[in-house]
Structures are given as structure tokens and as C-alpha cells.
Amino acid sequence: MISLFYIFATSLTKMQLLNILNHRLYLMHSIHRRVIMPVPTLKHFINGQYIESKGSEYFDLVSPVTGESYARSPNATVADVDDAYASAKEAFKIWGRSTPSARQQALLALADTVEKNAERLIESQSRNTGQLKHLIASEEIATSVDHIRFFAGAARFLEGKATAEYLSDMTSSIRREPLGVVGQVTPWNYPLMMAVWKIAPALAAGNTVVLKPSDTTPESTLLLAELSAPFFPAGTFNVVLGNASAGSLVVSHKTPAMVSITGSVRAGLQVASSAAANLTRAHLELGGKAPVVIFADADVDKAVEIIVTAGYFNAGQDCTAASRVLVHESVYDIFVTKLVAAAKATRFGDPEDKEALYGPLNNVRQLEQVTGFLARLPAHARIETGGRQADRSGYYFEPTVITGLEQEDEMIQTEIFGPVITVQKFLTEQDAIEKANDVKYGLASSVWTRDHGRALRLSRELDFGTVWINTHIPLTAEAPHGGFKNSGYGKDLSAYGFDEYTRIKHVMSSND
């Protein structure tokens, strides 16, 4: 039997046939390459270089945009973590004795290098998180560079009690010293910026670091460590990869003088317990459930505009997100109408979408958590808009507004970490204060009013580490960030954040 391809081929010119055959060979080669091309495997960054894991356990990194795996990451072993801490301990002998000006110069060089390598960092982080590239550039790269430069300056500004003779013939002075080696764990919502919040004050104070990034978003942190290598002694900044078991190895190790985590309340409790077993200092920045209190005299249009941005930015995956709105009954209806309209107009999209406000949720576990909250919604609650996974590939969730919830309901009391905003009524100022404070969290809050006295009263009464007035979510390197209650303790950013990574020593000398 004569094949159809033979009949087709005989009707073509020699050149046409050659082009077709070449194209078929190209396609076969491309398919073959796709099949056999190995998936990239990440390595730890220890002692100034990439190091293969000593273990055999690996897991897939999965794109939040497509749901497909694209790389493999090792799960750090005891030996890996021991090596990282040994390197950090050795590096501290050099870095811990460096001058403040030397630390400043190293950090300034790192900031410049991060700025120059912005595109590489954006690509690596977007691949891990699905975040919008234009917002990584404006909200993480630029901010991280600024924060590194701030702590470079802080390295040279050490404060303490004045040297004096507080006892007769005795002179007392105060030394502010680095702690030593610090163990750190960072989350997946802002991988680069959270790593900078940890390492910049630690390095500025003269400490060395072993850091474990989130298991789903390690690449921008690895690249940050690589970029830092030329400016610091080998072993100053080490990165070990892995899941919660690797994090447990980092925070329970006997070497660090302090352990620091940004993460969930559950993770923070585990870290605090591990640290307590070794009497290790702990620094915890944990979850939040920020109340947004809207009084009758507030600028409702401005409030809606900012709440939508602060509530849905990064798909609501922010501990300070404007997720729990309390509105005076007199403006409740108009506020809800405008908020729902703004939510419906909010655009989400893939990393290249420059018009979108947010991308997908970071991982399938987080998607299941958010959908689980909606599945358990009580009958008296109402979904005004959204409330479901978007009809597309990846872990996208629609912008959601929910009303009718009662104070004791799960969605009022528990951090959702998704693009979900709840709205409640309040009757009086005292009612607003009581409802705002009636959660286990204490990280951030905001008050919306034109009454200056009321704003000051609320800033005093609200039991949260940050109180914004007529805005929500901006942060600056010069001001502290940290919470109360189950949101943890210790401060990031500012001179207070720098002090977290130092210790105070009293030196008294006889004048005889």
C-alpha cells in the first residue's frame, strides 16, 4: 500500500519536501528535549557557595500560575544544618569583630548589587510566587534596597547609657555587642523583602546568619545570598532549604544565640517552644487580623479605595491586610455598596499583567485553606461578591466581600490570608474598640475619621502594634513593625529592629 505521505510528497518540489522533513526532525528533537530535559535541582548556600544536600529527600516546586512543577528542592538534613551553623560560627570570628563602617560599606554594596540585579530577582521570585512582576519591582525590590541602606546606616549609630562614675571611684560604661550566630525562618508571601528584614539588621549589628526560606519560595533568597557573597566573609549569610522539618532543625539547634521567624501563629508557637528548651532568645512576627474602623465622618470613597488595595494586594497574603472592616451603622449601607463595586472591578492576573492588583495564592495548601473558610461559612453570613476559586488554571481566587458575620464567627476570629474582606457594623466608639480588640492577634489596625481627638483615643485603645489613621498598610524603614498578643513579640525595621540583634554589656572599672 502506498502511504499517504508518499503520495503527498511526490506532489512537492524537492525544496518543499526538504523543508517539511527538517521541520519534522526539529519537532521530534524538541519533543525529545522536553521529555529528557532534567528538572533543575536547587542547592543550599553554605560558606559562600552552593552546596548539594547531604540527604536524599527532595520535593517539587510548583508554579502557582499553572499548578505544574518546575524544579526540585532538597530538604535539609541534620548534617546540612550543622554545616551551615559551623560556617556561620567560624565567620562570626571575623564579621563580629568588623568595624561599624566596614559593615556599612558591605551592606551598601549589597544594596547596589540588588538594585542592579533587579530583573534576576524579579524572575526568580515571580516563578516561585506567581506575584505580579511590576509590583515585585516597585514594592519589594525598591523597598528591600531602601531597607538594606537604612540598616547600613544603623550599623554606625549605636546608643547606650552615658559613661559615668555612678559609684564613687568606679567608672561604668555600656557595650552594645552582636549576639553571635542567628537562626532565621522566612515566609512565602514576600520572600525577598522578608529575608532582607531578617538579614539586614542582623548583619549590620555584626551577627552571622543561617536562614531557611519557605519551602515554596526559596529562589530569590538563594540569589540574595549569592549576590551578598563578594562583600562578606564566607559563611556570614547561609541559606538552607527545606520544609517545616528543616525549619525545626534551624530553630532548635544549640548554636544560635537568637532565632527569628516571620510566619503563622502555629509556627511561632513551635519556634518559641524550641527556643525555650535551649533558653535561646526568640523574635516572632506572626499572623494578624487587622481591624479597619470606619466612623460616620470618614471619607468613605477614600476608605474604600485604600481598603480594596490593602485588602487584596498580594492576594490578601499579608499579615497586615485590611481584612476585617468595622463600619458605623449610619454609613454601613453606602460603604458596603461602594466596597462591593470596587471589589468587582478589582483585576487579578498572571505575572506579566501590568493592570492587575494581585496574582494567585501561593500554593495549593493556601488555596484549600481559603476555600475551606468559605465552605464553613455560617448561614447568617452573606457573600456579597466573589467567594470562589477563579475559573482558570492556577491558584487564583476571586476578590471577595462577606457581610453578616458575628463577632465569634471563625472568619472574624481567624486569619484567612486570602483576598477576602469581611464587613461588620458597630454602634458606638466603645463598641468599635471592643470588637476591634476582640481577637487573639495584635499586629496592625487602622482608624478612619476626621475627628482628631477620636483618632488619638483610638490609637491609645487599640491593642495593635501599628495604628494607621486614614490610611492602611504603608511601612517605612524608620518605624518599627511588630505586634502584641498572638502576633508575637520583637520588632522588625527601625532602630528598634536593629536593637533586637544586639546585647548589652556593663563594664565597670575601678579608678584606683
Task: Identify the residue ranges that each predicted region occupies.
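ALDH superfamily catalytic-core signature
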Residues: R266-E406, Q430, I469
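Rossmann-like NAD(P) dinucleotide-binding subdomain of oxidoreductase/dehydrogenase enzymes
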Residues: G160-K302, F426
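Residue-level signal for inorganic ion chemistry
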Residues: G67, R103, Q125, I148, ...
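Conserved C-terminal structural/oligomerization subdomain of aldehyde/semialdehyde dehydrogenase
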Residues: T66-R72, P256, V293, R347, ...
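Short, well-ordered beta-strand elements within core beta-sheets of diverse protein domains
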Residues: Y70-A76, A91-R97, Q184, V292-F295, ...
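Hydrophobic face of amphipathic alpha-helices that form TPR/SEL1-like repeat modules
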Residues: I20-L21, Y26-V65
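Glycine-rich loop-to-alpha-helix module at the N-terminal edge of alpha/beta enzyme cores
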Residues: E68-L158
